[in-house]
């Protein structure tokens, strides 16, 4: 089976929320488990997806997306099930907490 999306992930990091969102939205994807211990995320093929070598990365027909918040927002906008639409008055609250969680809480 060919999937529109390929999620490069590891079980113990920010990839989990991406997997949960994809599952909750009912979006088919191919999970690509990375061997972080072997340095798969620093190899040339993965670095073409995410030049920082960080996990996760989502391959889409439009190119690769990285950064957890960016992936979540992109998926929500494409599949319209997990977030207020861009013209919804509640969109600002979503963005505020999405980026606070990604940039402040997750870093800690």
Go through each PLM region and give its residues.
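GST-like domain detector, emphasizing the conserved glutathione-binding G-site
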Residues: 1-108
